[in-house]
Amino acid sequence: MMLHIPGVLTNAQVAQCRELLDAAHWVDGNATSGAQSALAKRNRQLPEGSPVARAVGDAIQDALARHALFFSAALPLKVFPPLFNRYAGGETFGTHVDNAIRLLRGTDFRVRSDLSATLFLEEPDAYDGGELCVEDTYGVHRAKLPAGDLVLYPASSLHHVTPVTRGERVASFFWIQSMVRDDGDRTLLFQLDTQIQALSAEKGAKDPMVISLTGIYHNLLRKWADA
């Protein structure tokens, strides 16, 4: 499942993040690449240990913790600290798949990458190209979202970023280890939760059907979740 999650950051929060990011020191993006990704990657990135990356990443994680749609879709167990990249002047990232396990350098913190996320930090009309293209059995899905919006997709997907030919694309990217490892199971839970929320809004939280479906949701989560 590929999902557009709007409004993770407000316009004011995006502006605050960009003020810090634009003044930071950026390095060759291959500093964090695996061997296969390094063959396809041409962009710039903030070093993982950068104080700016930590500060802006903390702000993003705080926003994610308050975002009900993100929690419902991802069911996060662990989130890898957000990283940051920028593309300009024809920079691109060719087709690749993300590493299955991400290790935070200098620590024993590990994340199984069940889901990948890209949070856009530049408005789409400010640059040409820079589309995130995610492949699945139904074809190629493209994302180029407003600043502050996030796209979530299975980390097992082949994906690429098209060349940026005008302006600059700035984004945060990170990985999520979900409580529910299987993408199909996680998607079913998300669909069920969405319908429960809609029914609750229509009939009220005390409606017998809402209570029954909520019980089914939690029993499925109990069956499938690692916690």
Swiss-Prot record:
Cofactor note: Binds 1 Fe(2+) ion per subunit.
Domain Fe2OG dioxygenase: 78-178
Domain of life of the organism encoding this protein: Bacteria
Binding sites annotated in the UniProt record for 2-oxoglutarate: 169
SUPFAM superfamilies xrefs: Clavaminate synthase-like
Binding positions (Fe cation): 96, 98, 159
Pfam family, one: PKHD_C
UniProt entry tagged with the keyword Protease: no
UniProt entry keywords in alphabetical sequence: Dioxygenase, Iron, Metal-binding, Oxidoreductase, Vitamin C
EC number(s) given by UniProt: 1.14.11.-
The keyword Membrane belongs to this UniProt entry's keyword annotation: no
One GO MF term attached to the UniProt entry: 2-oxoglutarate-dependent dioxygenase activity
Biological processes per GO annotation: DNA damage response; intracellular iron ion homeostasis
Required co-factors: Fe(2+); L-ascorbate
Residue spans crossing the bilayer: none
InterPro entries hit by this protein: Oxoglu/Fe-dep_dioxygenase_dom (IPR005123), PKHD_C (IPR041097), PKHD_hydroxylase (IPR023550), Pro_4_hyd_alph (IPR006620), Pro_4_hyd_alph_FE2OG_OXY (IPR044862)
Protein name: PKHD-type hydroxylase Bamb_4192
